[in-house]
Amino acid sequence: MSSLLEVMDLTKGYGSGETRVDVLKGINLTVAEGETIALVGASGTGKSTLLHIMGTLDRPTSGSVRFGGEDVFRLGDAALASFRNHSIGFVFQFHHLLPEFTALENVMMPLLIAGVKRSDAAAPARELLGEVGLAHRLTHKPGELSGGEQQRVAIARALVLSPKLLLADEPTGNLDMKTSDEVHETLERVHRKRGVTLVIVTHNEKLASYMGRTVRLVDGRVVAD
């Protein structure tokens, strides 16, 4: 497999002088195309910070992130935002669905923002909702869905622009064990069908065990890979 993402000598710190806190300390990590990775470790070890920098939601203090060989943080803000929107999908612990819109409309939203006509956006959104097992919930609003269903809508929305990389930050953190298993099965299914590269931050050891690779962080450093 060829390399999709390379993290090189990455550091992230906050503050300065005696108040400086170093969250990431010289991270090196290569992610291959089509790979599935779990980032694990105790709370406060820098897992979510690393994921956010990999997804260009935050910038490193030093080091680089290369996507397809390009140092993405050399891009200007507008170019970086465009790259992020089309190349990376995100799923968070909370679904962040828009409550006034239906499941179908929520999944269509990234396409509409990207300038796709409403008539053209419906079909791919409907197809993805079918893939995550929600073909019967197209017209339901988030408040009418269970927690697991809400998260599956969020997964569909994250994939609707066909990103190469899907990043998930504690996607089952608010769910019970049975529902967590359903969300995991959904992630596995879309990975197999679409070949999307998947990186997950999780405390769920069962979920981590299903990933192809586990990367463990301790005190801002990779200690096992």
Swiss-Prot record:
Mode of membrane association: Peripheral membrane protein
Name of the encoding gene: lolD
GO cellular component, one term: plasma membrane
Protein name as it appears in the record: Lipoprotein-releasing system ATP-binding protein LolD
Residues that bind ATP: G41, A42, S43, G44, T45, G46, K47, S48
Statement: the UniProt record of this protein carries the keyword Transferase: no
Keyword Amino-acid biosynthesis on entry: no
Domain named ABC transporter: residues: 5-225
CDD domains the UniProt entry points to: ABC_MJ0796_LolCDE_FtsE
UniProt keyword annotations, A-Z: ATP-binding, Cell inner membrane, Cell membrane, Membrane, Nucleotide-binding, Translocase, Transport
MF (Gene Ontology): ATP binding; ATP hydrolysis activity; transmembrane transporter activity
Gene3D superfamilies from the UniProt entry: P-loop containing nucleotide triphosphate hydrolases (3.40.50.300)
PANTHER family per the UniProt record, alphabetical: IMPORT ATP-BINDING PROTEIN (PTHR24220), LIPOPROTEIN-RELEASING SYSTEM ATP-BINDING PROTEIN LOLD (PTHR24220:SF689)
Subunit details: The complex is composed of two ATP-binding proteins (LolD) and two transmembrane proteins (LolC and LolE).
Protein function: Part of the ABC transporter complex LolCDE involved in the translocation of mature outer membrane-directed lipoproteins, from the inner membrane to the periplasmic chaperone, LolA. Responsible for the formation of the LolA-lipoprotein complex in an ATP-dependent manner.
Protein family according to the UniProt entry: Belongs to the ABC transporter superfamily. Lipoprotein translocase (TC 3.A.1.125) family.
